[in-house]
UniProtKB/Swiss-Prot annotation:
Aquaporins facilitate the transport of water and small neutral solutes across cell membranes. This is Probable aquaporin PIP2-2. PROSITE patterns: MIP. Induction: Down-regulated by chilling. InterPro entries: Aquaporin-like, Aquaporin_transptr, MIP, MIP_CS. It is found in: Cell membrane. A motif (NPA 2) lies at residues 232-234. Belongs to the MIP/aquaporin (TC 1.A.8) family. PIP (TC 1.A.8.11) subfamily. It comes from Oryza sativa subsp. japonica (Rice). PANTHER family: AQUAPORIN OR AQUAGLYCEROPORIN RELATED. It holds the Pfam family MIP. It is a multi-pass membrane protein. GO terms for molecular function: water channel activity.
Length: 288
């Protein structure tokens, strides 16, 4: 384990050293973890967070499509509702809020792709990763189910918020969009939660959730026209299960394969290029 020393410059120009220590890699299988309440508390937090995330965001999508429906709102229907910008803000804003609320309990993953990337980087154990992903998928299904229950007259009519490949785009294009979008998200997660950054910015607790939420916002702006933006397999699965139409299931593999590949690339890039290269070049002083 390496213990690094980072120089910081307070007011007056004098530098003070601040130590930080990288946490040890999580064990692949930690059976003892199953006996701890903290694991189950974290799993519950992931379930509730993903439920709330899907409820708010899918309700926003359905509401926008209803407001912009020319058959319902004949006057300036195209300008009605929150628009794509508002949908992107709903997704990014909810991630910011929920990561802020759950980071100290579960790490605030709320996304199987994030959990998968952190597992590959040995940040979480296999047992925790599997339980998180199950909780996230179940939470997503329940969250979308609430939307359908509360907006039953609009839900099926406006597509149920399901991710589908838009007309005019090939499956390869959709897959590429999901890979790149998830890479941006997971890369941001690694950067925002880096131990060195946490040691430096620990007095500003919003600095981790803010860039993660903003990354989700930006990716949605870029990929909503292509796939409706997945980058979260639980989000795509939850809407497909409740909406349950052929089109949503036909493209479902894109919203699992793409995010998992993107997460794996982000994990490898951060762990074996950025962190490794910094150590080799001596960018940070080390007393280990």
């Amino acid at each position: 384990m390496a213990k690094d020393i980072e120089a910081s410059a307070p007011e007056g120009g004098e530098f003070s050293a601040k130590d930080y220590t990288d946490p040890p890699p999580a064990p692949l299988i930690d059976v003892e973890e199953l006996t701890k309440w903290s694991l189950y508390r974290a799993v519950i937090a992931e379930f509730i967070a993903t439920l709330l995330f899907l409820y708010i965001t899918v309700a926003t999508v359905i509401g926008y499509k209803h407001q912009s429906d020319a058959t319902v709102n004949t006057t300036d229907a195209a300008c009605s509702g929150v628009g794509i910008l508002g949908i992107a803000w709903a997704f990014g804003g909810m991630i910011f809020i929920l990561v802020y609320c759950t980071a100290g309990i579960s790490g605030g993953h709320i996304n199987p792709a994030v959990t998968f990337g952190l597992f590959l980087a040995r940040k979480v154990s296999l047992i925790r990763a599997v339980l998180y992903i199950i909780a996230q998928c179940l939470g997503a299904i329940c969250g979308v189910g609430l939307v359908k229950g509360f907006q039953s007259s609009y839900y099926a009519r406006y597509g149920g918020g399901a991710n589908e490949l838009s007309d005019g785009y090939s499956k390869g294009t959709g897959l590429g969009a999901e890979i790149i979008g998830t890479f941006v998200l997971v890369y941001t997660v690694f950067s925002a939660t880096d131990p060195k950054r946490n040691a430096r910015d620990s007095h500003i607790p919003v600095l981790a959730p803010l860039p993660i939420g903003f990354a989700v916002f930006m990716v949605h702006l870029a990929t909503i026209p292509i796939t409706g933006t997945g980058i979260n397999p639980a989000r795509s699965l939850g809407t497909a299960v409740i909406y349950n139409k052929d089109k949503a299931w036909d493209d479902q593999w894109i919203f699992w394969v793409g995010p998992l590949i993107g997460a794996a690339i982000a994990a490898a890039y951060h762990q074996y290029v950025l962190r490794a290269s910094a150590a080799k070049l001596g960018s940070y002083r080390s007393n280990a």
